[in-house]
């Protein structure tokens, strides 16, 4: 036995309790010559081979029957490239020794990762197929600073943690190892002897692909090529652009009718993408596609932030879907969940035996509502992990926007907590200062690194400046969901029309704060689940009135300032709540033309008309783009306003939220002339009563509502009409 190798070291190495395998294994200089040591469980014979000649240059002696081999090459003093000829169960294999390769991570990468400023940590951490010194294999690295030992286990080593213990880079807490022969498509995990001496098997936080539930292994996968956004895609996200978002849960938009199984990414590219384009939407928003173990979370409890879920196919299949959307002129928004993660043992929870990614105190690190864990945003490496993930989706897949979920739960320490269940910040306040700084930093980096890409916030409180710059105290988002508008308008619409006159302010209140943020008007998935009913089913009255109310509401929404968002199924007035385990009710559109077809045609026309007329979208966030013409007619539940573009062109929007037609309804206007009815939600085309104004109306020089000229209209029952000035 080598005098340099202590029996206790060999025992610890074989038992998986040794933290520095490179100090023992591989090739080492000794006084007697070069010494090669290898841990090869179940091997019976090991030779050192010189690759250039194929010549055997020395045999390794088995010093421990459990698989520790050692041998001196007496005539060799300088390190050289070598291979090992290993006999297992009577068969000889030629392998490259992982322990002959030097450190993998560059010093700059190690420094940036430790500092938490590595913009693209996924390029260094995780698993990356590579060639080193002419040998093909895979580089593995994982951050686990408090672990006593970390090994790579996988299909290439029989999931045996003894075979590939990793090197610790103490300056960064990162463990690394190059494994020759490991290749794309193979499964792997990290086996950790944690800070408390317990064995943990963890999936790779940076894995680009993972197994589909219930399996939990990571998969070696190539890093996708960078995607350069086109000028058209960048313009489509701007504040003056028409933005109409079709929100989709990929697993339940449509399913195979024979077995209720999901459509694949490629099938969705062939079916969903052309449908959304035909309907006139400008953006697709996807509920989270990150890998997640529980279908019922809809993806909002992710365990693989860097891995598109395998439910619908591979990473390349997902890229195919995104490319198809872009080719169809659709921008893609991804729901992103940096607010919390599930406590599954294979994932991030107590990753190295300590609360590495989460806060240790449950008053800071545990979500009572969702039984999930909260990221420790104050820890640089954790924040870096999340910021890098944002760039990953945008740069490597061409995602055009991220919609950040549950922002309020991130920025308030007392979110959904009673007194005594939360810890104030350093100033005694309720704000989570670390989360606020994380969001500001993420938005800043997106703006700097991915021109044209944007972020959207689902923020349910009145936190000031969500879409304002950080230097003025804001969070730096581009857009914010207007949940207040959504709640107020739905509360109004569910009322019997006879009572709406007493709640007129629910439709007008939104304009009092409309210009405080850059708003998206969302009718999202959250509004059609958990007993809330479908949007259609919330409307009052008989079937005719329900559909008429819904059409009038959509006409109001598409004209109101703010970008639009509609969850799948609402575009054809699905009658039941959304069920993530089943397809949408496409059968409602089968057979003869019906009310559902009418709503679908209306939404299509709303989208195309909205996109065509700048007055409906160009000045969403400018006071000049909106003006009330009739705001106080609560007795008749009539509201009329003007939308305006930069050139001063106007579109008049008039809504009657009662079932009583309003004939000879006169109101003052700004621009006299001939006005054409460009949309009427009561049209027979949409299965309405076809009450209207014959297509064109002329203004009168009759004073009304403080204006010299006026229009005299028929306002259809439970309807919204749009009029465009087309001449004197």
From Swiss-Prot:
Pathway listed for it? Glycan biosynthesis; glycogen biosynthesis
Q: What is its quaternary makeup?
A: Monomer.
Molecular function (Gene Ontology), one example: 1,4-alpha-glucan branching enzyme activity
Q: What is its EC number?
A: 2.4.1.18
Question: What does this chain do?
Answer: Catalyzes the formation of the alpha-1,6-glucosidic linkages in glycogen by scission of a 1,4-alpha-linked oligosaccharide from growing alpha-1,4-glucan chains and the subsequent attachment of the oligosaccharide to the alpha-1,6 position.
Catalysed transformations (reactions): Transfers a segment of a (1->4)-alpha-D-glucan chain to a primary hydroxy group in a similar glucan chain
Q: Which GO terms describe its cellular component?
A: cytosol
Question: Where does the source fall among the domains of life?
Answer: Bacteria
The entry assigns this protein to a family as follows: Belongs to the glycosyl hydrolase 13 family. GlgB subfamily.
Keywords of the record, alphabetical order, are:
Carbohydrate metabolism, Glycogen biosynthesis, Glycogen metabolism, Glycosyltransferase, Transferase
- InterPro entries in the record, alphabetically? A-amylase/branching_C, Branching_enzy, GlgB, GlgB_N, GlgB_N_E_set_prok, Glyco_hydro_13_cat_dom, Glyco_hydro_13_N, Glyco_hydro_b
Q: Record's Pfam families? A: Alpha-amylase (PF00128), Alpha-amylase_C (PF02806), CBM_48 (PF02922), GlgB_N (PF22019)
Query: Which sites are catalytic?
Result: 405 (nucleophile), 458 (proton donor)
Q: What is this protein called?
A: 1,4-alpha-glucan branching enzyme GlgB
GO annotation (BP), single: glycogen biosynthetic process
In its UniProt entry, the species of origin is given as Salmonella paratyphi A (strain ATCC 9150 / SARB42)
């Amino acid at each position: 036995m080598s005098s340099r190798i202590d029996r206790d070291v060999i025992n610890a190495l074989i038992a998986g309790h040794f933290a520095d395998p490179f100090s023992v294994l591989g090739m080492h200089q000794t006084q007697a010559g070069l010494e090669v040591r290898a841990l090869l469980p179940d091997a019976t014979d090991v030779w050192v081979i010189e690759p250039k000649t194929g010549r055997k240059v020395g045999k390794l002696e088995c010093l421990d029957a459990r698989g520790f081999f050692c041998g001196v090459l007496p005539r060799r003093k300088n390190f050289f490239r070598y291979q090992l000829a290993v006999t297992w169960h009577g068969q000889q294999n030629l392998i490259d020794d992982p322990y002959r390769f030097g450190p993998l991570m560059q010093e700059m990468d190690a420094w940036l990762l430790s500092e938490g400023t590595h913009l693209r940590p996924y390029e260094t951490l995780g698993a990356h197929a590579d060639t080193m010194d002419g040998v093909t294999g895979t580089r593995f690295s994982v951050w686990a600073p408090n672990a006593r030992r970390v090994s790579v286990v996988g299909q290439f080593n029989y999931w045996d943690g003894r075979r590939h213990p990793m090197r610790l880079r103490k300056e960064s807490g990162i463990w690394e190892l190059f494994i020759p022969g490991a290749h794309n498509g193979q499964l792997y995990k990290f086996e950790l002897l944690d800070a408390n001496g317990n064995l943990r098997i963890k999936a790779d936080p940076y894995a680009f692909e993972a197994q589909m539930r219930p399996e939990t292994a990571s998969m070696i996968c190539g890093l996708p090529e960078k995607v350069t956004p086109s000028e058209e895609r960048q313009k489509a996200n701007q504040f003056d652009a028409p933005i109409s978002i079709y929100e989709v849960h990929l697993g339940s938009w449509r399913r195979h009718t024979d077995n209720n199984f999901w459509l694949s990414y490629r099938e969705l590219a062939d079916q969903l993408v052309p449908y959304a384009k035909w309907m006139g939407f400008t953006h697709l928003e996807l509920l989270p596609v990150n890998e997640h173990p529980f279908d019922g979370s809809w993806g909002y409890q992710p365990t693989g932030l860097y891995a598109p879920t395998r439910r619908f196919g591979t990473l390349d299949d997902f890229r195919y879907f995104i490319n198809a959307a872009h080719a169809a002129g659709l921008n893609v928004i991804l729901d992103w969940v940096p607010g919390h993660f599930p406590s599954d043992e294979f994932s991030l929870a107590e990753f190295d035996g300590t609360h590495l990614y989460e806060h240790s105190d449950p008053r800071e690190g545990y979500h009572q509502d969702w039984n999930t864990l909260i990221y420790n945003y104050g820890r640089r490496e954790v924040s870096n992990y999340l910021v890098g993930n944002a760039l990953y989706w945008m740069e490597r897949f061409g995602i055009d926007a991220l919609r950040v979920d549950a922002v309020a739960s991130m920025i308030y320490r007392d979110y959904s907590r009673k007194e005594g269940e939360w810890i104030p910040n350093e100033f005694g306040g309720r704000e989570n200062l670390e989360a606020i700084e994380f969001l500001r930093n993420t938005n800043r980096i997106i703006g700097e690194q991915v021109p044209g890409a944007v972020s959207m916030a689902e923020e349910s409180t009145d936190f000031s400046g969500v879409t304002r710059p950080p230097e003025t105290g804001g969070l730096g988002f581009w857009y914010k969901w207007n949940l207040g508008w959504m709640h107020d308008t739905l509360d109004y619409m569910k009322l019997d029309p006879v009572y709406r006159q007493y709640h007129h302010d629910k439709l007008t209140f939104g304009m009092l704060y409309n210009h405080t943020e850059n708003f998206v008007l969302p009718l999202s998935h959250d509004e059609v689940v958990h007993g809330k009913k479908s949007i259609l089913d919330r409307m009052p009255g008989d079937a005719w009135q329900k559909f008429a109310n819904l059409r009038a509401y959509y006409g109001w929404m598409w004209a109101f300032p703010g970008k639009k968002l509609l969850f799948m199924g609402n575009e054809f007035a699905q009658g039941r709540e959304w069920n993530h385990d089943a397809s949408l009710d496409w059968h409602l559109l089968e057979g003869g033309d019906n009310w559902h077809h009418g709503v679908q045609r209306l939404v299509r026309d709303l989208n195309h008309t909205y996109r065509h007329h700048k007055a409906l979208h160009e000045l969403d966030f400018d006071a000049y783009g909106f003006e009330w013409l009739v705001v106080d007619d609560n007795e008749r539940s009539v509201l009329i306003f003007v939308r305006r573009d930069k050139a001063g062109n106007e579109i008049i929007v008039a809504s009657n939220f009662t079932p009583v037609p309003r004939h000879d309804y006169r109101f003052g206007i700004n621009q006299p002339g001939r006005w054409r009815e460009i949309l009427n939600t009561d049209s027979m085309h949409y299965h309405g009563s076809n009450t209207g104004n014959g297509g064109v109306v002329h203004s009168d020089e009759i004073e009304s509502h403080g204006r010299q000229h006026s229009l005299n209209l028929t306002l259809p029952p439970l309807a919204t009409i749009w009029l465009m000035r087309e001449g004197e």
